[in-house]
Amino acid sequence: MWSLLLVPISMICYDYLKSPIDLLYFSKLGRPLLGIQNTFRDIIHNTSKHIVRNYPGLFLIKMHHKNIREEFDRIAPTLEKKYYHDIDPWFEKNDNYYFYKIENFPVLYSLVKQIKCIDTSVAAFAVVEGPMIIPPHRAESNKLLRYQLTIHGNGDCSLYTGDGRHIHREGEDILFDHAKYHELIKTGDARRVTLILDVHR
């Protein structure tokens, strides 16, 4: 009987002990249950490569980079900035790290809604101004993958994942499991803008 408990406990421990360890892991009652689900998905998708072309329609985002950038440049200056530190206690107060929801960009929003593999609940343009380090972290759930397309970036900003370094240059994209280790290091003063989308596995 007690031996049966070892399975879920082991699955929770496996998820909890992933690098970097999430210090807020046990602050939510449902998080251990998410840990079991995460471990189960890790077992199923252990050898999966995250390639954009394997997700129907996702390639269209990069193809429309120029139009997306033009719409961002036109509309973003008219919008109020939303700050990550206001929605997530993990982030320290930082007025140079903010976002705009894509619902405010009608052409992009129309395109995204046509691509069935995209979950639009957190779809946004993420903006980093000036030098910045976002320390190693990971999402609570691995149910969704994270897609990023660089709208503005001159190469002074890099995203590090378990697969290595991705340099944020205009028009370049990446798909990765954001429930595993990733961190961001930006060394220059230029503004970096990325389109962030969550993608169903």
Regions found by a protein language model. Name each.
Residues 2-144, 154-157, 191-193:
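Fe(II)/2-oxoglutarate oxygenase catalytic core
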Residues 124-126, 150, 160, 185, ...:
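Residues in well-ordered beta-strands of folded domains
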Residues 127-132, 149-155, 180, 199-201:
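Short, flexible loop/turn elements at secondary-structure junctions
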Residues 134-137, 158-160, 176, 182-188:
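Short beta-strand His + acidic residue motifs that chelate non-heme Fe in jelly-roll/DSBH
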Residues 146-150, 175, 190-201:
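A short hydrophobic beta-strand segment most commonly corresponding to one strand
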Residues 151-170:
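A short beta-strand-loop-beta hairpin characteristic of the jelly-roll/cupin
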Residues 167-181:
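Conserved metal-binding segment of the jelly-roll/cupin
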